[in-house]
Structures are given as C-alpha cells and as structure tokens.
C-alpha cells in the first residue's frame, strides 16, 4: 500500500471513529435571542410537517403547544395575553404555528390571535403529555424542542451557563449573545412548569455558587488551576439535589471569591474579575464570598434565587450591600457533602432572594424537616426584642431602621430593649472564660478555625494533586487565602482546639443567656435580636487597598456563626448618597439583620429519633435502679423518653459526650457499641432557660444495641451503668424523685 493510500485509509478510519453530537442551536426571533435545546420534548405529530412560514431556520420553526383542554376558542386570546405577562420566553411570534390538545374544539383553524400574526392550528398528536408553552418545531421529524431565552450576564456574576439534561446531569449551555467579556445564560419558559405540593419549586430558576458539585460540571472554587486540574463531578451534592427534587431549574454556576474566603475588589480578585454590584453608582463592592449570588439576584429579574454559603458572612454581606434577602440558618441543617469547605464547623448553605414567599419555599425545600414553617397554624411570637449597637439618630439610615423597629414592636406587642453584649458577657460569663472580654476571647477564633481547617481539607490535597501532574509545581492562589493559610501555618496546632473551645464557650453562653430556644414549638425563639451590618456608605471598587491580613477581631455579624443561630437579612429601604464617580446623587440600600434562637427542632427532634428506632428495643435500666424491658415497642420507648418527667422536660438541657468506644459484632445483623459517656444536665427554673436551678452530671458506660432491619441499621436498645455522679444528678429528671420533691 502506497503512502497516499495509507494516509487516506488512516484519515477514513479516524473519520469513521469520530462522532457528531448536537449541543443545541442559537436562533433569533423578532430580535430576541434563543437557544434551541438539543433534547426533544416529544413529537407533536408523526413524521414531517408541511408548514408555510417565513420563520424556518435550520429546519426549526417557532411553535406554541396548548396541552390542556381547559380553554375555548374565545378564551385563547386572553390565555396568550396572560402568557405574555407571566413568561419572558414566550412571545406572539410563537403563534404562527399552534398545536392544540383538543383540536375539535376549534372551528376556525386559521386565526389572528395577535395583531400582525396569522396562526395555523394543528392537532396535538402525542401519546404523552407535552407541557404547554413555546417550542421550536423540527419540521423534518415533528419533534418539538424547548426554547431557552438568552441573557447577557452583564454583571459578571456567572462562570458557567448550564443546561439540565433529561438524565439528571448537566452540560454547558453552548450559546453566546453579543457581549463584552461576559457569558450568556439561558432560561427555559416558565410555562413548562406547574407548582405542586410535591414540586413547590417547579420552574424556579436558580444560580449556584461555584463550590457546590453538580453532576457533569467542573467546579472551580474561584481558582483557575483548580478548574483545569479536576474532572467533572460524578454526582450532585445533597443540598442541591434537595432543590432539584423539588423542581428547581439550575441555570448556571456563579462566581465565588477564591475558596470562599473574603476578598475585596479589585486587587484581591486575581484569577477572576469580581462581579458588579448594581446599587448606587454601579462600582461598589459586592461583598463576598457569595459575590456572584448577590450580584445576580440584585441585577437580573429573570433569575429567581441564588444559592450561596455563609461561613463568616458570605451570604449576609452581599445581601446587605445589594438590598436583598439573605439567610444564614442554624448550623447543620443539611449535609454539605460534595461542597468545598472553608470550615465544616462554620459552613452553612443559604439563599439570596428578592421574593420572601419564594425564599420561604426554598428554605423548606433545602432544609426539609429541619425547617420550621408556620404556614398552616398560627404562631406565638416572642415578646423579647433586643436592639444591638443601633446607629445614632443623626445618620441617614437611622429613621428607616427606627420605623421598622417601631412597627415590629407593635406587631409583637412588646417594647424594644437596647442590649450591650459586652456588659451582659461581663455580668454572666462562665467562670472558665476567666476575666477575658468578648473581644479578647474571640479575637483569633474565626481566623484560627478557617485557616487551620481549610489548609488541611483543601490546600493540602490540592497542592499534592497539582504537583503530581505539574512536575512538583505549586498552583497560583490569590493573596487572601494564601495570607490566611500562611498565618495558620505559623501558629501551633493547639490554636485550633483553643478556638473551638472559645467558640463553644460563647455558643453555650449566648444560647443560654441571651437567646435561648423556647420550649413552645409555636414560638421556637425566646426573643429576636436586631443588629445592623451595613452603614449605607460607599465602599468603591476603584480604590487601592492594603495587603490582606488574617480576619482578626469579633463583630456582631459573627454572633450567629459562633452561636450556630439563624441570622437573616431583610431589606428596608434606601438612602441618597452623593457619588464622586457619577458626580450625582445615587441610592444605597438599608437592611437589618434579625437573629433568632438556634432552631428548637434541633434541641429535641423526636421525629428523627423515631425514624432510627428498631420495631422493638431491649432497654435495661437495672444498673441504675430502674426496670428492664426485653422488647419495648418503639412507640412505648418514644413515649417514655419524650415524657415531661424525662427528656421531654422543657426545663432540662442535656449534653452527652462519648469517650472511649469499641464495637462488638454479634452477627451479620446485630452489633453492640460499648461507649464511655459523660451526660451533663442543667435544670432551669422555667422553659425560657434563663436561670439555672441545679446541675447534675453522670459518668457511665453504656451498651447500645443496633440491628439491621430491612437492610437498614436501627437503634435497638441500651444498657447504661453509672460509675459516678456529680452535683445533684438524682434530681435532674422529675421522674427520678418523689412528687413532694419535684422542683421545689
């Protein structure tokens, strides 16, 4: 075989082995840019379609599908008028070709439902339901493809535009509209989706911070080297899957400051350019680390929600400076698997939103049964309203804040109380804190936790993996995370344990003395604490800043992250401020933070306990002078432990610490855990948990029994043996002593 023949053979072989896969098509209809999904929604007719239209492009024509039969010929025009109002994807140009489910109801097959548009109506011939709305019809196959409207990300909030695939994975939405150094985002028609009890987020468009893994998507964490080093994710994390399962449509990945550390534009943002804050003169700091999330919600009406994370203020900061809703929930409400950590001890996922009703529905979808919602019953509102470090009355935003406080106090039927956290600490601080002030106790706590945790969990494996494929080189890292990691390296390993101890000291003090949880499930929080996180002043991005330093100090915004309490931002209004950039008066938002007690449901979650119980439990209390049950039913066990005489007592707070442990494998379906325990208890004079009546601690060993039931491991009983007690342990539970002694 000659050289030319060999070349031709190899070229042919290479061609035969290649594949051509469609990734969608971009079209323009009446001056509006669209993306035609590569995935068919189904056939509206069998075979090709002969349609006389001037709109045919690449075999696609715009079409409207009407799937239901709840219409008449006379109501179609009002239906289309309503569609123009509720949907930004559909437009009258889609009316040239209409497919209707109940074709026989129409007597006129050619009609003008909109001025200037002549409609041809065809029967909808399908065996499965195609949602109503705008589509692009492939005239050769009779298949309709969903229409996505394309928008320019002019605020620079996104890193990737995504398309959800039918198999649950994601791929890049391959389209670009005319723009200057910004990407294009595609959104599907809202008409395709119907909200139901099972799908309360159906059709809700969401952007996701670039630290959450999505199946089929490469994650960057704000670092170019990271993005190019690691492959696409194989699975979607629990938090994002919760939203998808409830109907959410994820349209793109959004910018984060690098590795979710706090960065200031513009110098700190080296690998990627910081998103733009649309408020004021348009050149203000968007705050971080959920910068893309905040910027997008403040900039785009076509986006409904953005998912961010809050470790030290990464949601609340962007919400504050851009005048939108944002929340840091109680810590630990949802798993953060497949999420890049700053510190698991502090990380929480939350939302940035414009619509409080949608915000509420999203919270319920994300946090599931750990989210308390009073939509179906009347709550009892707390009567304590604390004001923390409110601005002086002569500041521009003070009147707006005071107006809100006045209305809230009236609604709660209470009076606000100014609180000095430092004085309260000095008056009631635990003895183990010594003479330290809050500022002294917590000065390095945040810096120590995030620098030590992230260096171990993120930097070390990242550096190792990068070096393995780049001849031992180090990847580039922005100045802020690098400065924090470097400082952490210079500190002793004991710094982290000291920081965790100090955080716990503050958490126990705050949750016991300032905002204890309420025993009333219709109240949850004993009070509300209001503080102001922003001053309605310009913080421009066109300024030179000093080199980064570790985040030392303690501020009111850190209360919730150390106490693990919810802290939500509410926009209230705006104030005029003169801009030297525009040489004009612009407006900046005014917001307020509302802190509540750590979720009551997290203190005693009986539903979660019931779910892990075996049908029958072996309960042996003979070693502590009580009875033994060889086969106590799960319901009886729940009734016993949740009784007011036992763990259900709202005046008792308990904490169990596990020490040494070993496991005994009895069989394939039974295991015994041998645990060393310290059970600490405090009894309060009332359910507000303000005043301690007595303490009682028990040191014990405990056998916990576990059995496999229907393939799932369940808790099947316990056998405690007390070694010694401290204080008045015998008087902790009301069921442990005589009626005459009860809480006298």
From Swiss-Prot:
Keywords, sorted A to Z: Lyase
Annotated signal peptide: none
Function according to Swiss-Prot or TrEMBL: Scytalone dehydratase-like protein; part of the Pks2 gene cluster that mediates the formation of infectious structures (appressoria), enabling these fungi to kill insects faster. The product of the Pks2 gene cluster is different from the one of Pks1 and has still not been identified.
PANTHER family: AMIDASE 1
Chain positions recorded as substrate binding sites: 621, 702
Natural source organism: Metarhizium brunneum (strain ARSEF 3297)
Disulfide bridge map: none
Family recorded in the similarity comment: Belongs to the scytalone dehydratase family.
Designated name of the protein: Scytalone dehydratase-like protein Arp1
A single GO molecular function term of this UniProt record: lyase activity
Pfam family, one: Scytalone_dh
Residues of the active site: 656, 681
Description of how the protein assembles with itself and partners: Homotrimer. Each subunit contains an active site, located in the central part of the hydrophobic core of the monomer, which functions independently.
Annotated EC: 4.2.1.-
